[in-house]
From Swiss-Prot:
Family membership: Belongs to the lipid-translocating exporter (LTE) (TC 9.A.26.1) family.
Protein name stated in the entry: Uncharacterized membrane protein YLR046C
Coiled-coil positions: none
Lineage of origin: Eukaryota, Fungi, Dikarya, Ascomycota, Saccharomycotina
Annotated GO CC locations: fungal-type vacuole; membrane
Species this chain originates from: Saccharomyces cerevisiae (strain ATCC 204508 / S288c)
Amino acid sequence: MATHTSKRRIHRWENNELSEENSTIIYFPARGLMWTHFPFVLGICLEFVGYVLKIVFINSPSISTFIAQSVLLLIAPSLYALSIFMLFSKMARLILMEAYMLIPAKFSTVSFVVADMIGRVLQAVGGGLLSSWNSRNTGRILIIVGLFIQIFCYTFLTFSQLFLHYKMKATPSKIVRDSNEWFQYNFILLAGILLVNGRTIVRVVQFLMGLQSYIGQHEWCLYVFDTVLMFLLPLIFLATFRARNLFKLQDKSVNIQLNKLLDKESVSED
């Protein structure tokens, strides 16, 4: 979070001690940044509950337990992706390079959330239909459509991150030039979305091949290409969070922006 010094300086800005023409600054309240991480935490919880139910199903098989664990494990990674997207959008704004996003943040956020939600709903409905033999094929199709929607979203986000990374190298803002931590943070987000997309592609292959396919009949495939990937993702974020998180990076951005505004104010007073 912002340091005490930065908070005092933000307070000065908020109380209009700077002249109006020099009072533009980009920052997010700490509570807003905390909520940006909420889908990620929820995804971890759903993954945990999903695997607990998987153990319960192995010891005491029932169709309801199977459906519940399947739906939770299908939906949880999309929550990781949602947090990654929101963090990426905020990062682009904090480095004053939102113009280099493939779609402006205010439009892309709504589009991503809606598309991702549609994908999740289709997977949840499809997972429910798997319980009935007559509707099992319909459920499988709905899950596949939902997964393809998410693959499109995640691929778009990947290209957005790569394009912004290129622009950060080619035409960096003053904030980016001040520290390479922004590049490192973008790499963390990029690694996260690649893991989610890789896992989603494996799931599409599984359902395209059918529930009786090799992947469906051999649990090790899902453990290697789903469980391991989704274990690595939160592990990477948790391991790097102390050193690289948006709270600390925002503090750097705010300080640079305020220094620039105060310099302008000093020049205008002279």
